[in-house]
Amino acid sequence: MKLGDRIFALSHLWVQFPEYRKFILEQKEKHGAFITLDNSAAERALVTEDVLIDVCKELMPDEVIAPDVLFDKNETIANAVKFKIRMDNEKLSDKINIFFCPQGKTKQDWLLAYEWGLDQDWIKVIGFSKIAVPNAWLDTFEDDQKIMEARHECYDYLKERNLLQKPIHCLGQGDPTEFSYYDHPMMRSTDSVFPVLAASHDQLFENDHETRIPTPHNYLETYDMSQVDMSKVEANVTFLRNQCNIAWLNVNSSTIPF
């Protein structure tokens, strides 16, 4: 099932599930879908560079998120450089854009990683992680809480300093009304499984868009969607879409059983 405008493919699911690979390939080959390949760091899947390169060769996505390490600026930058060299050696750099997700334990570290990403001409897209941004920008961090507040603070800071210079993709979401705030043309796109997760708990955004049920890290592999009212999923996606000034919306509905 596909409810978004393009496909956000998770590399660990590509490796694990043949039916997932079939669905993603059909969206690419039959429908010409724009595909972002995620490295699955947020899912703690520990996908290696070798695996990510192999998936790139099989899928040939439009863009791939370079391997990042949660909250670690130095390792994330080092991984991105190493990944770029590997992409060059595999002759993939001229076919697949590289997407960089800044990391850092502090706001200062995160900003250093972000500005480093701006300075690399081979980095085409930058991600605002639902995990990394709240961790760096808020005084206290709680999993999947205050995502909107943290990203608004980050956005305001960057906008005021003319640092929104490359397309931004918001990785995941909290309160879906977050996206109505963005008016800068570099705010490109978002993805989230939350409209599906919320519907599975009978949460309709039109009634309650503030409560954020934390997403289990293995949610996409293990949750049984057979009893979920898909009209509620569609209503939540519509609510989210109506908040978006950004160009593209991804809903990880491709992970619902086919």
Question: Model regions: which residues?
Answer:
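Alpha/beta catalytic cores of nucleotide-metabolism and tRNA/nucleoside-modifying enzymes
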Residues: 53, 119, 152-169, 175-258
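Non-catalytic, usually N-terminal nucleic-acid engagement modules in DNA/RNA processing proteins
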Residues: 1-92, 253-258
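Eukaryote-skewed repeat-based solenoidal scaffolds used as protein-protein interaction platforms
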Residues: 56-190, 195
